[in-house]
Curated annotation (Swiss-Prot):
Keyword Transmembrane: no
Key words of the record: Disulfide bond, Nematocyst, Secreted, Toxin
Name of the protein in question: Kappa-isophellitoxin-Tst1a
Record-annotated site: Buried residue in the protein structure. This inaccessibility may explain the lack of activity against ion channels: 24
Expression by tissue: Predominantly expressed in mesenterial filaments (at protein level), a morphological structure that has a functional role in prey killing and digestion. Also expressed in club-tips, tentacles, actinopharynx, body column, mesenterial filaments and pedal disk.
Length: 36
């Protein structure tokens, strides 16, 4: 189960990481913030 446990600011930061980092994408929950 995936849940968004991040603030909006953290979510935006993670979204940028998802867009630029395949490693981040692989290690993170795909549904985090609905961005990965």
């Amino acid at each position: 189960a995936c849940e968004n446990n991040f603030s909006d600011r953290e979510c935006e930061r993670r979204k940028k990481d998802c867009d630029s980092s395949m490693k981040f994408r692989e290690l993170s929950c795909p549904k985090t913030c609905g961005t990965c």
